[in-house]
Amino acid sequence: MGKIIGIDLGTTNSCVSILEGNTPKVIENSEGARTTPSIIAYMEDGEILVGAPAKRQAVTNPRNTLYAVKRLIGRKFEEKEVQKDIGLMPYAIVKADNGDAWVGVRDQKLAPPQVSAEVLRKMKKTAEDYLGEPVTEAVITVPAYFNDSQRQATKDAGRIAGLDVKRIINEPTAAALAFGMDKNEKGDRKIAVYDLGGGTFDISIIEIADVDGEKQFEVLSTNGDTFLGGEDFDQRIIDYIIGEFKKEQGVDLSKDVLALQRLKEAAEKAKIELSSSQQTEINLPYITADASGPKHLNLKITRAKLEALVEELITRTIEPCRTAIKDAGVKVSDIDDVILVGGMTRMPKVQEQVREFFGKEARKDVNPDEAVAVGAAIQGSVLSGDRTDVLLLDVTPLSLGIETLGGVMTKMINKNTTIPTKHAQVFSTADDNQPAVTIKVYQGEREMATGNKMLGEFNLEGIAPAPRGTPQIEVSFDIDANGILHVGAKDKATGKENRITIKANSGLSEDEIQRMVKDAEANAEEDKRARELADARNQADALIHSTRKALGEYGEKLEAGEKEKIEAAIKDLEDAARGGDKAEIDAKVNALSEASQKLGEKVYADMQAQAGEGAAAGAGAAGGAQQQAQPQDDNVVDAEFKEVNDKK
């Protein structure tokens, strides 16, 4: 059985890890980096770039370069968070037939899981290159506050990428695993994991206990905001730059997608620089042009200015911390360690706010970029049976229930319930002789069902005619270890039953997933063919270059017919290399190799002759030197000669 890899599928960056024995290993990608930008570019010729190559070309291809797609996964187009992003993203966010938020790229509509699958495929390939064997199984992390639709969509992304997703695990829980497995402290410890990433914020309170030599990780509570992260911090900087430039130059950059892409890059860079310095300069020549000529952008931003711009965003993270502490039934003073996860936690102001709230410094021995992937790899080794000394008890982040009479949300499973879990409750009909009931499933904390997120609905039909309130319909909720919900309804009188795995009444259908899997496989084949064609062209170019060079130096030593044959073979190979037929290129490479065999023999003979002359000249020079030396100092040479004889 192959390794189960751990993947942190991030909004801004992604990371992959495995366990070697008991030691976690974060794997470097093909560019040599331990994290990969979650950026995907769709090129004109059909090529798909992922990671650093996609990021490098974003400025010149903003409409077809997708980033922060995780913010759209499992969401409806009409949601206010999605509507907010439509005005900010340089790429098109469109409404799918099922009402989901999809993206529009080069005249095609793509589902967010399909786009995220490209990043997962890159992570899969990174692990395969390192391990030297195929990888088919993974543990993928999601924000703890992801709802059922978002978890399901992430699982779908894994399937499209060719991965069997063994477990969906919460990011803060994964970070706690990475932290806890590394420590040898005895006794129970309560830790707070504050996770502020590129697009999401989570806070989890977790208890780590030693139970008979087994480390038990129990999540006491979790809270967060799935639309708050580094992307929002970047946007505050971008808005500030646009405002300042408009005041100074009278030009609105927000309407220029090329300028926006350059501003996005500059804002991210400035934000990172201001974590270690007090001031930075944004310098973007030729940012735009008007009738008076080109315009240049030059602006200084201080750390204090950045902190003022994002203060409200940082403050927004504190309320979920209060709620999580309250829900866990602990006091702030009970927290033994605070762990910071996510790139945004490098910002000094974020660290200061966390310190003020928890009354202690956060741990500095956890890598905020890698801890989540490492934790996922540890969970992978637990699932594969390689580790048996770890028990993980996670929770469902939001309450689950159904709509009952009057539009009320009747909760079946409360938030922060340890998963997996089951719950059943008996309901009845609202009307006399009602032949069917519709079960509408919701997730959230509001009292009225419409204030919560609707996950799906289904019907139970064939109820025997009876007065209202008489039939007994048992509704059961079952949450698996991935946090994904299965709901059933059963008429106790007739035994009629209906069960579904909740897939938001949007989400991807099985047919759509299968089609995307096939597309991905076809793309992988196409990528392989494209790479083989590129290799063949490179080989052809190298052979043409070396043959031409040899022909220039040794051509006059060949007969005219031989020379013409080689030149014709070069031309044939050049023509083939311009085409797209790898077999044709290979055939012409062989033809040129055969045609230039005589030339190769001439080159080899010439090199041997040169080497022979060099050796002879060297020997002659040494002999001459010896003869010259003899008359000058005959005795020394004789004495040396006799001394050698004596030793024999």
Swiss-Prot record:
Induction: By stress conditions e.g. heat shock. GO terms for molecular function: ATP binding; ATP-dependent protein folding chaperone; unfolded protein binding. The modification Phosphothreonine is found at T200. The keyword Chaperone applies. Keywords: ATP-binding, Chaperone, Nucleotide-binding, Phosphoprotein, Stress response. CDD domains: ASKHA_NBD_HSP70_DnaK-like. It holds the Pfam family HSP70. PROSITE patterns: HSP70_1 (PS00297), HSP70_2 (PS00329), HSP70_3 (PS01036). Residues 612-635 are annotated as: Disordered. It comes from the Bacteria. Belongs to the heat shock protein 70 family. Acts as a chaperone. This is Chaperone protein DnaK. The lineage of its organism: Bacteria, Pseudomonadati, Pseudomonadota, Betaproteobacteria, Burkholderiales. The gene is dnaK.
